[in-house]
Curated annotation (Swiss-Prot):
Protein name: Lipoyl synthase
Binding-site residues, [4Fe-4S] cluster 2: C97, C101, C104
Superkingdom: Bacteria
This enzyme's EC code(s): 2.8.1.8
Gene: lipA
């Protein structure tokens, strides 16, 4: 049977745009009122423009291997910097999510079937880039019996075969209702770092993470740690959505109580006027203070700063270097 030719990038982008923004957040429990204009950012929020020869080279390589990155699909403000250094966070299992989180710019809809060749294409691209540390994440796939955990494992195994020296970090969804099956699938090829983001404080979950559960996410981190005690676990929070600093500190404590080793704290930025607004811009000094408290609590690796994202300079995070 002949293989279906992928849609040209322009056509794919037009289709995806219809699944973002207003249409995505139209049916969530807590209604998001569109803002009328972009908020002015403080001077400490600066991002590199996504242009330059290395950015174009990496985009070409990704299209050649029919791969997506969360950098592009989620409109990450650090895309220009990361692509400019030849690094990317790979987004597997397509670029259409089964969830409607109003902080995220990834499209919502009915996902395509899994691509059985994606692990091979992913491993080839990573080999071509010569990456020493790679981050692999995914959309939520509530349509799959294991939430896509086996596909994660296939990708990890393919990368290890192609690039045995590459350190593999996975940023996984919550595998809602499928934790046992997902964790069992991951035992066949555990990563070097297991990351699952809590994203925000429990009080804001209904508005920020509709369909997710704070305690479930904590249990996922703890259960993986029980199964793989030598593999570091990691989580992250976005700040500026209306949380109190005391609530953030309590989440940090909850993470430590559930065996989490690594932590990222960054500023939430509104992807579009239809997404959740920024309630406030947390100062660099506040990020520094939270980072100090996290280290006092026993986190082995902490990245805390306005432009920090879960996978921002993940190689340096894993090495224990300061990332802000």
């Amino acid at each position: 049977m002949s293989q279906k030719t992928p849609s040209p990038p322009g056509e794919l982008k037009r289709d995806i745009r219809a699944l973002k923004g207003a249409s995505k957040v139209a049916r969530i429990p807590v209604k998001v009122e569109p803002t009328t204009e972009r908020q002015r950012k403080p001077h400490w929020i600066r991002a590199k423009a996504p242009i330059g020869p290395e950015v174009l080279r990496l985009k070409g390589l990704l299209r050649e291997h029919r791969l997506h990155t969360v950098c592009e699909e989620a409109s990450c403000p650090n895309l220009g910097e990361c692509f400019g250094h030849g690094t990317a966070t790979f987004l597997i299992m397509g670029n259409i999510c089964t969830r409607r989180c109003p902080f995220c710019d990834v499209a919502h809809g009915r996902p395509d079937p899994l691509d059985a060749e994606e692990p091979m294409h992913l491993a080839q691209a990573i080999g071509a880039m010569g990456l020493r540390h790679v981050v692999v994440t995914s959309v939520d796939r509530d349509d799959l019996r294991d939430g896509g955990a086996a596909h994660f494992t296939h990708c990890i195994q393919a990368i290890r075969t192609q690039s045995p020296q590459t350190r593999i970090e996975v940023l996984v969804p919550d595998f809602r209702g499928r934790m046992d099956r997902a964790l069992e699938a991951l035992t066949a090829g555990p990563p070097d770092i297991f990351n699952h983001n809590l994203e925000t404080v429990p009080r804001l979950y209904k508005a920020v993470r509709p369909g997710a559960d704070y305690l479930w996410s904590l249990r996922l981190l703890a259960r993986f740690k029980e199964d793989h005690p030598t593999v570091p676990t990691k989580s992250g929070l976005m700040l500026g959505l209306g949380e109190e600093l005391a609530e953030v500190e309590q989440v940090m404590k909850d993470l430590r109580d559930h065996g989490c080793d690594m932590l990222t704290l960054g500023q939430y930025l509104q992807p579009s006027l239809y997404h959740l607004p920024v309630r406030r811009f947390v100062t660099p000094e506040e990020f520094d203070g939270l980072g100090d408290k996290a280290r006092e609590m026993g986190f082995t690796h902490v990245a805390s700063g306005p432009m920090v994202r879960s996978s921002y300079h993940a190689d340096r995070q894993a090495a224990g270097e300061s990332v802000v």
